[in-house]
Amino acid sequence: MYGEACDKDTRVEPGSTARRITLAHTMHRTIFDTPVINTLLRLFSVAFLRITGWKVQGSLPPECAKSVFIAAPHTSNWDLPYTLMVAFALRLNIYWMGKESIFKPPFRGLMMWLGGIPVDRAKANNLVAASADALQAADGPLQLVVPPEGTRSKVRYWKTGFYYIAVAAQVPIVMSYLDYHQKITGIGPVLRPTGDLEADMVAIKAFYAPFKGKNPEQF
């Protein structure tokens, strides 16, 4: 359910209608900027993770207030609720990309309120450019969560849209993780894109290699 990556070429020319629509989706109001509910859900999330044996590691460096998050491994529908709870626990302000099918009525409003951005990869769109613009234009902290696998199924190659969003927005890439075997989750290393995609992807995949998703055979 949760998660949809984008490719480098999912872009259109600046000023197009599609550009304005996607940018509006990216900047919509979410549960993370709803004060009372945010506070209550943070208390619930911290308590739930602690009771169920999860350990939340790391914290977001100040220079990463605007950033692109890698979300991996992505192998289960459970990844979304855990991601949301970790975001509350770490006081993040996230938006996440999800496949268009989970945004259909009657769930569209709820999914967008939870920070979702619908992605329809069957159609040409401008998600990379619009997401980068949204990060740059944000008045406060904004973390865009992208699962580079793009699906819960096992894939040979990761999609690179997250990388090009970070390059275009001139923001760092934060490696976040969920390890269901060790029950650890949180924020890992920060990568500043060098422009050498191949070398940077080698470093990213090396970091994620030890982690096990809920369905490890799919990672």
Regions found by a protein language model. Give the residues of each.
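Basic polycationic patches enriched in arginine
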Residues: 11, 19-20
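Soluble catalytic domains of membrane acyltransferases
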Residues: 31, 51-210, 215-219
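Extreme N-terminal tail/first-helix region
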Residues: 24-54
